[in-house]
Amino acid sequence: MEELVINHQRVPVTVRRSARARRLRLQIESDKPELVLVIPRYALSMQIDSFIRKQTPWIEKHWNQALKKAAKRPKRNQKDGDTYFYFGETLTLKLIPSLSWKPGIRVDGNNLEITLHQATSLSDGKKAIKKTVQGFYKKKAEEVIHDRLQFFNEHYGLKYNRVTFRNQKTRWGSCSSAKNLNFNWRLIMAPIEIIDYVVVHELCHLKHMNHSADFWKLVAETIPNHKELRKWMKDNHYLLSYT
């Protein structure tokens, strides 16, 4: 880990040397946040220094944006009062002592209630909370997305094979050439219209494995406001983190 100082601001930098990279590249990892500098294997120090100087305005602008987003992201310590997103709504974590060693979880109004054995230690409790919420999110995402796939495919009548769910850093859905669909279970934190958009987006890739005009025309048959929803994802995706 290194750092840059730009306009009296310390910017942490992770340097990644890549045999496949053809040029110097910068990106902001908003989850941390940090600046990532990708360097081709044979790049010279003078080339790197010159590149960073030229990119200073870009770094300053996007770093400040990343800091603002990080400040809005919920801070979770796996304790009472933490906030979680569920279908775009904010739920407050409420811990309830129990005599059962098996944690329980349910949504009650604006609360996300988790029951833990009353003798659970602080460290074990934090691990149990994180695991329980993750399992809850994944289970609900599978239920909802399977249901929405079936609903929208009544219109499209397309054939797909396997449907899988993962926790991916930046990808919300994908469609393979083998007609397998993959979805990020963190979508369960987004409003239902966003979930629907991602579901339809991947369904339409079964017919058009590109983002051509025909692809977007197919999406618009059921999601006419897809541009608005894409913008929401671009502006708010960082809120759908689970750490």
Language model segments and positions:
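Active-site-proximal or metal-binding-adjacent scaffold patches in catalytic folds
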Residues: 1-197, 206-243
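Walker B catalytic acidic pair
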Residues: 202
